[in-house]
Amino acid sequence: MKITVPELALVALVGASGSGKSTFARSHFRPTEILSSDFFRGLVRDDENDQSATKDAFDVLHYVAAKRLAAGKMVVVDATNVQPESRKPLVALAREYHCIPVAIVLDLPERVCQDRNKSRPDRDFGPHVVRNHVRSLRQSLRGLEREGFRHVFVLRSEEEIAAATVTREPLYNDRKADHGPFDIIGDIHGCFDELTALLTKLGYAVDGVAVRPPEGRKAVFLGDLVDRGPRSPDVLRLVMGMVADGTALCVPGNHDMKLLRKLRGRDVQITHGLAETREQLAGETPEFVAQVRAFLDGLVSHYVLDGGKLVVAHAGMKAEMQGRGSGKVRDFALYGETTGETDEFGLPVRHNWAAEYRGAATVVYGHTPVPAPEWLNHTLNPRVPRVV
């Protein structure tokens, strides 16, 4: 089996005592990435098999795991993890640090685990322990995804374990290898004529919805492609074409995601320009609308570019969320941060996250209209209000 894990993940090894978790971990992960419950028992009590040390050992393990995840380092938890209550803190840690929880399950026959433990004098704790491990594992195995594990891999034989490979892959938002130069364009809102005029001024060759960039340049669209303006379908055609050609990147805006929910048949409020977009799309073919739905569904919350020096997102991105993947990261990218209050128009009061930003990467974002583009703590919002 080919096991693919994100470069930043919390990997929980799951299996009965004797299933080979530690051997598997050493074969596929760096020593510094592996946090073993046995090691931490020894650390706090000088005895890796002292079960009375389990609580203290896991307190320290979770502490170290949190520090590694905060630093953007992978964590591999080498423990039995056969019960939901033992896995719950691991999923919570992954969510707290906006990384992806992965479960790799070694579901070997009980007989194999029993035989292995018999050959180890330090595992003389009776066959009932392994029996209970196997029972607990199989009772909860189907629920791992419901518990919050994004990826679950199950190995059911010694042969499968021996043949398994582990490959790391960057998150979708990792575009550090793209160095630009970039032309970053925010909040088009259906204004096709203005968009083509801007691209032309930037040196792009525009022919209808076909666009050819200047040599080496790439456009980056900050979302909110639709609503309010008169030509949302044409904006979508142009941007979708550039992304397909590899001449542009695009992140989603909150208006785009609201349109996607409507296209999926969800019940949404027809406000803030969505009525105009629906009316314009009504004149398009079902095939085009399906393409729009697929395009919007595939948009990534934010991108980290230029060796990590540049981050682009519709509504901004805090330093601790950059290059990570979680529901909270996506929500922040779409909506920014709010205070929980509403203004006199019933709209949410936005918290000025940029005033507190101290990250090393430059963050360019849109979403909130500003009187003029202004640099603030390595952030830039170029969205100037316009009359539509």
Outline where the language-model segments fall.
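Conserved GTP-binding G-domain of TRAFAC-class P-loop NTPases and closely related GTPase folds
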Residues: 2-14, 31, 108-168
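The Walker A (P-loop) glycine that initiates the GxxxxGKT/S ATP-binding motif of P-loop NTPases
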Residues: 12-18, 366
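Active-site neighborhood of divalent metal-dependent phosphoester bond hydrolases
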Residues: 129-131, 214-216, 228-304, 309-312, ...
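Conserved beta-sheet core of the metallophosphoesterase superfamily
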Residues: 347-388
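N-terminal active-site segment of His-dependent metallophosphoesterases
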Residues: 160-236
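ATP-dependent NMP and nucleoside kinases share a basic, alpha-helical "lid"
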Residues: 43, 47, 82-122
